[in-house]
UniProtKB/Swiss-Prot annotation:
The lineage of its organism: Bacteria, Pseudomonadati, Pseudomonadota, Alphaproteobacteria, Rickettsiales. This is Large ribosomal subunit protein bL9. One of its GO terms (biological process) is translation. SUPFAM superfamilies: L9 N-domain-like (SSF55658), Ribosomal protein L9 C-domain (SSF55653). It comes from Rickettsia peacockii (strain Rustic). Binds to the 23S rRNA. Pfam families: Ribosomal_L9_C, Ribosomal_L9_N.
């Protein structure tokens, strides 16, 4: 299937790119998410005319996302959970919970689909989580999962100590 991107898509292309993609990927993801349109002759002509509009709109969205990224950057989210004796959680910390807490902290609604978890958080500790609000921009937040507030503070002190040691080694 041949498509024209109308929004930038990570690892695929930028606005106005004409690409051949698998039929299922185009039909089930790109078209319903309004990331692309079919590459017919009338659509190709339309994109040539409207490419500047799409790019201006994307630039405006990108500027807004950069402001949000500045708020998100260096956030530390603390989750207090019950655990077994070996530090394993009863359940897990989900991307929805991270999105809700982050939205609460910065007063801006973040969707759970913007939270990228490499693997589920199922034990206490410090985790880095990627927040992707735009195809070309992402932010990193620190998620601390602990049994109590005092344990969370210990994790924070430990992280600051490691960071200062890393800075001393690199100097």
């Amino acid at each position: 299937m041949e498509i024209i991107l109308i929004k930038p898509v990570r690892k695929l292309g930028k606005i106005g790119d004409i690409l051949k993609v698998a039929d299922g990927f185009g039909r089930n993801y790109l078209l319903p998410q309004k990331l692309a349109i079919r590459a017919t002759e009338p659509n190709k002509e339309l994109i040539v005319k409207q490419k500047h509009e799409f790019e201006a709109k994307d630039k405006q969205i990108r500027e807004e996302v950069e402001k949000i990224n500045a708020l998100i950057k260096d956030q530390q989210l603390v989750f207090i959970r019950q655990t077994s004796n070996d530090g394993k959680l009863f359940g897990s910390v989900t991307n929805k919970e991270i999105a809700d807490k982050l939205s609460e902290n910065i007063s801006y609604n973040i969707s759970h689909s913007n939270i990228i978890l490499d693997k589920q958080i199922k034990s206490t500790g410090i985790y880095t989580v990627e927040i992707r609000l735009h195809a070309e921009l992402n932010a990193i937040v620190t998620v601390i999962v602990a049994r109590s507030e005092s344990e969370a503070q210990d994790y924070l002190r430990e992280q600051k100590t490691e960071t200062s040691e890393d800075l001393a080694e690199s100097a």
